[in-house]
Amino acid sequence: MLETVFDCETNGLLDVVDRVHVVSYKDETMREPESIYDYEDIKEFFKQDRIFIGHHIIGYDFPALAKVLQVSKPKRLVDTYPLAVTLMPKRGSYGLEGFGVDYGVPKPVVKDWENLTREDYTFRCESDVKINWCLWEDLRRKLMELYG
């Protein structure tokens, strides 16, 4: 089963979100992330037999995807946010921006969320996937050290 790191960019927090701009993802068969824009394609993607891995996906991504696209939470998922808090308790900051600094993958700065181009949303989303891919590799390594 493919371990698949993903992220989505939307138009707001859970109380106002009504649009998904892009879903980007990477699995172990890919060198670079790919992106999906079409709502039907996004729905089909989350029906695939994969392990879906993301940062804060339980608290935001899947609730937002459910609200906008009626996407059900997959059976197999890993949220790297609480996992990082548990396995890296002394870190202090658990946002992808800080991890991006650690891994040499800068998180793009956004000043105007409402007027980005599709390319801007995609670049940000794919950058988050690259950062989270590195984080997932670290977390998986720590889990293997603990549990073999």
Outline where the language-model segments fall.
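Short alpha-helical "patches" and their helix-cap loops
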Residues: 38, 100, 145-148
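Mixed-charge, glycine-rich, non-catalytic linkers/tails in nucleic-acid processing enzymes
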Residues: 74, 114-148
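Conserved RNase H-like, two-metal-ion catalytic cores of nucleic-acid enzymes
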Residues: 1-90
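Conserved structured core elements
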Residues: 40, 59, 90-93, 123-133
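A short, charged helix-loop
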Residues: 98-120
